UniProtKB/Swiss-Prot annotation:
Family: Belongs to the enolase family.
Pathway assignment: Carbohydrate degradation; glycolysis; pyruvate from D-glyceraldehyde 3-phosphate: step 4/5
Cofactor: Mg(2+)
Lineage, uppermost ranks: Bacteria, Bacillati, Cyanobacteriota, Cyanophyceae, Synechococcales
Naturally occurring in which organism (per UniProt): Synechococcus sp. (strain CC9311)
Name of the protein: Enolase
Cofactor detail note: Binds a second Mg(2+) ion via substrate during catalysis.
One example of a Gene Ontology biological process annotation: glycolytic process
InterPro entries assigned: Enolase, Enolase-like_C_sf, Enolase-like_N, Enolase_C, Enolase_CS, Enolase_N
E.C. number(s) listed in UniProt: 4.2.1.11
Active site: 209, 338
Binding locations of Mg(2+): 245, 286, 313
Length: 430
């Protein structure tokens, strides 16, 4: 019989490991009194929002300044003594203790990478201690909804060394009957796309997130994706639609958007996006405008918010204060959820909850610098978010999340419901 003392935190260890770009990141391991343990590794981003929680790096020459030994030391020397003796079941208290110890507004005291690693590892240790899968521990008996994947098959912007301005062109197989079929559909289009690019004499090398990185214009990318969907035997807009991550903050300066050889005002940028929506089966646009262009976002929401899911990534940075500002101003209609933007599991769950109560969708997301950690797959099911964005159909750190979702779907059996089959995937908002 399980004793409550078995779930008390006994030891916390941390180490510096590598992410998918060969950069150091933080791994934490939480061991409980009863012998159960949980391990987690934090990701890192390339196109990071100015309002994200602080990722602590060492500086200096080692690893070109990107080492994380300071964050590791903070876990073992400051966080561990504060948390040992607390129950791993009380996630809120564990995270609150770390936030109090940090003492800053943006987690610069301990480092968001240190706090998040311990936060996620604690949840996994608690789940293991109870003998539950992580999605069930976090989500309870209602955790049965498998997410629609937003598959980043063409990479540009900060994620690839090519001339493509927009950062991500994604496949959205919302017309599948279940997650397994959605994954198959996306994979078949991915391989068809590779053949089409090869026939055009274009590069089929891949970017940070496993998608192809050819030298294409934004409209050319849309055209070749629609062609790949059709050639693979699917109906664009009906079975598989498109999603964009414009990452417009990356080319925004002095109130103008500079891309494709032009310079555009916020209103002109909205015009550009509307033209793309009119031409292609696009159902979701992420970061269509810059992170602090609130007036532009209001116009974008007015023009396209009923037709298209408008996702705030840099705009909201998984932060309830910024999300509440957007809700109050009727800006965007969806939030991208990145656990390392806010830096703790509790705050991540609070952001998802606020979005849901306000009629906003949530898209659970990876980062461009990923690892083999599959927490976000379980998180997507646990929160019934209905959508996950975890890269292309290549590179093991991306596929690991898809494979975990396959396992979860199998484990749920007849209880499993695919969000696309119930209309709970990407959508606009009246």
């Amino acid at each position: 019989m399980l004793d409550s003392l078995d779930l008390v935190i006994d030891t916390i260890v941390a180490r510096e490991v590598l992410d998918s770009r060969g950069n150091p990141t933080v791994e934490a391991e939480v061991l409980l009194e009863g012998g159960a343990s949980g391990r987690a590794i934090v990701p890192s981003g390339a196109s990071t929002g100015a309002h994200e929680a602080h990722e602590l790096r060492d500086g200096g020459d080692r690893y070109m300044g990107k080492g994380v030994t300071k964050a590791v030391d903070h876990i073992e020397e400051r966080i561990a003594p504060a948390l040992c003796g607390l129950s791993a079941l009380d996630q809120g208290s564990v995270d609150a203790a770390m936030l109090e110890l940090d003492g800053s507004d943006n987690k610069s005291g301990l480092g968001a990478n240190a706090i998040l690693a311990v936060s996620m590892a604690t949840a996994r240790a608690a789940a293991n201690g109870l003998g539950l899968p992580l999605y069930r521990y976090l989500g309870g008996p209602m955790a049965t909804l498998l997410p629609v994947p937003l598959m980043n098959v063409i990479n540009g912007g900060a994620h690839a060394a090519n001339n493509l301005d927009f950062q991500e062109f994604m496949l959205v197989p919302h017309g599948a009957p279940n997650f397994r079929e959605a994954l198959r559909m996306g994979t078949e289009v991915f391989h068809t796309l590779k053949n089409l690019l090869s026939e055009r004499g274009m590069s089929t090398s891949v970017g940070d997130e496993g998608g192809f990185a050819p030298d294409l214009g934004n409209e050319e990318a849309g055209e070749v994706l629609v062609q790949a969907i059709e050639k693979a035997g699917y109906k664009p807009g009906e079975q598989i639609s498109l999603a964009l991550d414009v990452a417009s903050t990356e080319f925004y300066s002095d109130g103008r958007y500079a891309f494709s050889g032009g310079s555009y005002s916020s209103a002109e940028m909205v015009d550009q996006l509307e033209q793309l929506v009119n031409r292609f089966p696009i159902i979701s646009i992420e970061d269509g405008l810059a992170e602090d262009d609130w007036e532009g976002w209001a116009l974008l929401t007015e023009r396209l918010g009923k037709r298209v899911q408008l996702v705030g990534d840099d705009l909201f940075v998984t932060n309830t204060k910024r999300l509440q500002r957007g809700i109050d101003a009727n800006t965007a209609n969806s939030i991208l959820i990145k656990v390392n933007q806010i830096g703790s599991l509790t705050e991540t769950l609070q952001a998802i909850d606020l979005a849901g109560r306000s009629g906003y969708t949530s898209v659970i997301s990876h980062r461009s610098g990923e690892t083999e950690d599959t927490t976000i797959a379980d998180l997507a099911v646990a929160t019934r978010a209905g959508q996950i964005k975890t890269g292309s159909l290549s590179r093991s750190e991306r596929v690991a999340k898809y494979n975990q979702l396959l396992r979860i779907e199998d484990e749920l059996g007849d209880q499993a419901v695919y969000a696309g089959a119930t209309g709970q995937g990407p959508r606009g908002r009246d």
